[in-house]
Amino acid sequence: MLVEVLLNTPAQLSLPLYLPDDETFASFYPGENPSLLAAIQSAVHQPHGSYIYFWSREGGGRSHLLHAACAELSQQGEAVGYVPLDKRAYFIPEVLEGMEQLALVCIDNIECIAGDEQWEMAMFNLYNRIVETGRTRLLITGDRPPRQLNLGLPDLASRLDWGQIYKLQPLSDDEKLQALQLRAKLRGFELPEDVGRFLLKRLDREMRTLFMTLDQLDRASITAQRKLTIPFVKEILSL
């Protein structure tokens, strides 16, 4: 999926961002987060602006939900923007200029700009412009609540503390298994429970790692024309 973010630099450049095709609302397993999922879906489908901030220490689905929101609106022909601030070395703060004209703006990993005066001011100004226009949905993620971000600009921390704020609750091991099985089902194959529990026991339990491993096993299964079993998984993953 291609999402184009406008960079209002003197050269009027545009920056294409490729987001995962499989990170949609349908593939998100909510676990104990149905209220957050419902709030984001509601915001996406409302014709007016809104602001939601959600955070978690572990990551665990923050980017997935932003990607899903972008996918939902971009498929409807709306202009959306996704800015991963953990990769801000590839951007300039001016990337945020003009984003209040978009239907949706997603800011990922805002904790990464703490202490960066230029980025903090650019984010503060964008927030104010979005509030003034009243048309743009704004979704922001962080690794902690807004007041704990150690931002150098107190007014930005104050702004981020307005609106709807959620903690993204981590999945239990049983929920991670169900999330893996859901992802497998959407990709057209079955993940047996014993294989899923084996993966949870032997691998890093971080969901992105688990999903990447699931993709690897899917490809290997197709190539070898074999179903997923524990012996086959051990062979492919050298466990």
Swiss-Prot record:
Record key words, sorted = DNA replication, DNA replication inhibitor
Instruction: Name a single GO biological process.
Output: DNA replication initiation
Q: What InterPro entries does its record include?
A: Chromosome_initiator_DnaA-like, DnaA_dom, Hda, Hda_Enterobact, Hda_lid, P-loop_NTPase
Q: Which family does it belong to?
A: Belongs to the DnaA family. HdA subfamily.
- Its job: Mediates the interaction of DNA replication initiator protein DnaA with DNA polymerase subunit beta sliding clamp (dnaN). Stimulates hydrolysis of ATP-DnaA to ADP-DnaA, rendering DnaA inactive for reinitiation, a process called regulatory inhibition of DnaA or RIDA.
Q: How does it assemble?
A: The active form seems to be an ADP-bound monomer. Forms the RIDA complex (regulatory inactivation of DnaA) of ATP-DnaA, ADP-Hda and the DNA-loaded beta sliding clamp (dnaN).
What's this protein's name? Answer: DnaA regulatory inactivator Hda
User: Can you name the source organism?
Assistant: Yersinia pestis
- Gene (UniProt): hda
